[in-house]
From Swiss-Prot:
Gene: rlmN
Function: Specifically methylates position 2 of adenine 2503 in 23S rRNA and position 2 of adenine 37 in tRNAs.
GO molecular function, a single term: tRNA binding
Cofactor note: Binds 1 [4Fe-4S] cluster. The cluster is coordinated with 3 cysteines and an exchangeable S-adenosyl-L-methionine.
Protein name: Probable dual-specificity RNA methyltransferase RlmN
Organism listed in the record: Picosynechococcus sp. (strain ATCC 27264 / PCC 7002 / PR-6) (Agmenellum quadruplicatum)
Miscellaneous section: Reaction proceeds by a ping-pong mechanism involving intermediate methylation of a conserved cysteine residue.
Length: 346
């Protein structure tokens, strides 16, 4: 965004800014609270500020998006298409459970990783999101649910480590300004050379989830074309460095594709690869999409794969994506809308 925006600024930065508008420094704290706690879209909403100031500054960009489309699944999951200042559309998902509210945020418009099984990858890459555009997604969900967001996962559109600078800025704000603990933040990556190492140097207590999806290089390249530039052994070496530096357990994500990477031999090979790792494996049965021919394995095949990992002392669980009825798996709702008539803004 060419013009400066307020969302993403710290309390000292907002205090400095408010003084440039002719207001006393204490107004900075008020602005900070209205921005991050009340989630305003417009400065004219700040009723504790003088009317003349609100009229003068009402059009100054806060940095909020508009909800272009929203869909709710029977399980309560809410999928949002958010329209950015330049008209581009991104996806966000709010996932409620009994004691928490998790937001799945996007870090890019589209994605350059081009994973064969991902709807977002089929749409190509447009641009990186700025930090405030990531923070905005969390505030949007928090306001819509009228419930405090407890967890944020960077598992929406885009490759977070390809946009590391803005992702780190958003993490700082989510932690310090919105009050979400670092251990409640998860960054997912398919792997970008040297960026896991760069993330480790930040000394954060977040969770890193590595999208592995295959036990060997050849199979990984066949479903993740960009993996040709990042051999699986180099990826795992960086993962070991990450654990050594951060003392944090890794998560490995593994999407199960029927007949592709879900065979018993694949499970045994994966167990061998991850032996000795301080990690947990999340097995994710595939969410079918219209653009690609992959299918979800049956429950028996899933359970056999899981049992083989357990027999090799690998910590593992099966994670079923919520919100399938709302096309909430990454990329699905946006892709479906692009094939249909434009949705009514609401």
């Amino acid at each position: 965004m060419p013009q400066d925006v307020l969302l993403g600024k710290s309390l000292p930065e907002l205090t400095d800014w408010i003084e440039t508008t002719g207001q006393p420094a204490y107004r900075g704290k008020q602005l900070y609270n209205w921005l991050y706690q009340k989630g305003i879209h417009d400065l004219s909403e700040i009723t504790v500020f003088p009317k003349a100031w609100r009229e003068q500054m009402g059009t100054y960009p806060v940095g909020r998006s508009q909800i272009h489309h929203q869909r709710t699944a029977p399980d309560g999951t809410r999928k949002y298409l958010l329209q950015l200042h330049d008209g581009l559309i991104i996806e966000t998902v709010g996932i409620p459970t009994e004691k928490r509210l998790t937001v799945c945020v996007s870090s890019q418009v589209g994605c350059a990783m081009a994973c064969d099984f991902c709807a977002t990858g089929k749409s190509g890459f447009t641009r990186h999101l700025q930090a405030h555009e990531i923070i905005d997604q969390v505030l949007t969900v928090q306001t819509d649910f009228q419930q405090r967001v407890s967890h944020v996962v960077f598992m929406g559109m885009g490759e977070p480590l390809a946009n590391l600078e803005q992702v780190l800025k958003s993490i700082q704000s989510l932690n310090q300004d919105i009050g979400i603990g670092q251990r409640s933040l998860t960054v997912s990556t398919v792997g970008v050379p040297d960026q896991i190492r760069a993330l480790a140097q930040q000394n954060l207590q977040i969770t890193l989830a590595v999208s592995l999806h295959a036990p060997n290089q050849a199979l990984r390249e066949s479903i993740i074309p960009t993996a040709v530039h990042y051999p699986i052994e180099a990826l795992l070496d960086e993962c070991r460095e990450y654990v050594a530096i951060t003392r944090r357990r890794l998560s490995f994500e593994y999407i199960l594709l029927a007949g592709v990477n879900d065979l018993p031999d694949h499970a045994a090979e994966l167990a061998k690869k991850l032996k000795g790792f301080q990690s947990h494996v999340n097995l994710i049965p595939y969410n079918p999409i219209t653009e690609v021919p992959f299918q979800r394995p049956g429950k028996k095949r899933i359970n056999v794969f899981k049992q083989i990992l357990q027999d090799h002392k690998i910590a593992v669980s099966v994670r079923y994506s919520k919100g399938l009825e709302a096309d909430a798996a990454c990329g699905q709702l946006r892709s479906n809308l692009r094939r249909s008539a434009p949705a009514t803004v609401k």
